[in-house]
Amino acid sequence: MRFKNRFQRFMNHRAPANGRYKPTCYEHAANCYTHAFLIVPAIVGSALLHRLSDDCWEKITAWIYGMGLCALFIVSTVFHIVSWKKSHLRTVEHCFHMCDRMVIYFFIAASYAPWLNLRELGPLASHMRWFIWLMAAGGTIYVFLYHEKYKVVELFFYLTMGFSPALVVTSMNNTDGLQELACGGLIYCLGVVFFKSDGIIPFAHAIWHLFVATAAAVHYYAIWKYLYRSPTDFMRHL
């Protein structure tokens, strides 16, 4: 109780079961900045992977991954700005909140795309290349139908989609980069604690954003190091 009283201006009460948490102005600002600052690095990083690509398939994969990465930070930033400054536009805010939730599904699919597209897979495992996008489409439909109604179910979908392709990736003959992939996944899972702690921990959602940024950086490093060329090769091609 003493902790809550001390930080009351930085945190509001928890949201009802079927409602959305209302951040304080401080939390709104933190939510915006923690992802806004990552938009440019995401764009630059995506362009770097495209530049390092050897063939058309690697370029396509770089664009898929890059678009998912950039979309995550852009949509999140726009939603939090609208939620902070234009909250009176209920319909607009609701639409962007849905987009913010839907883009997570496609970001998960895009994050696995380099591993599924550029590594040799067995006949059964290769089906995950398209099945993960089917899961993303299913998650999008779920958001349209049940947005904010069953939060635990939504969280279960995110975690299931995040872990399912990992089972396939770990079965590949070439295991380079899997430690970084697992490390990033663990960081995402730890961040979920803060994702579900609005109204309990001040700036919980902004802290969740930092976990997302850290995990995404670890995964990007693994993709850059093990699936694309080294900086030395890149400089040679300039």
Swiss-Prot record:
Subcellular location, record wording: Late endosome membrane; Lysosome membrane
Keyword field contains Membrane: yes
Cytoplasmic face residues: 1-28, 83-101, 146-151, 196-198
Tissue: Exhibits relatively ubiquitous expression with preferential expression in mature (in vitro differentiated) macrophages.
GO CC, alphabetical: Golgi apparatus; late endosome membrane; lysosomal membrane; membrane; plasma membrane
GO MF entry, a single one: protein kinase activity
Residue spans, topological domain Lumenal: 50-61, 123-124, 173-174, 220-238
GO biological process: positive regulation of neuron differentiation; positive regulation of protein kinase activity; regulation of protein localization
Entry keywords, A to Z: Endosome, Lysosome, Membrane, Receptor, Transmembrane, Transmembrane helix
Membrane topology: Multi-pass membrane protein
Database matches in InterPro entries: AdipoR/HlyIII-related (IPR004254), Hy-lIII (IPR005744)
Transmembrane among keywords: yes
TM stretches of this protein: 29-49, 62-82, 102-122, 125-145, 152-172, 175-195, 199-219
Function: Involved in the dynamics of lysosomal membranes associated with microglial activation following brain lesion.
Sequence similarity: Belongs to the ADIPOR family.
NCBIfam families cross-referenced by the UniProt entry: hlyIII
Name the UniProt record assigns to this protein: Monocyte to macrophage differentiation factor
Protein's organism: Homo sapiens
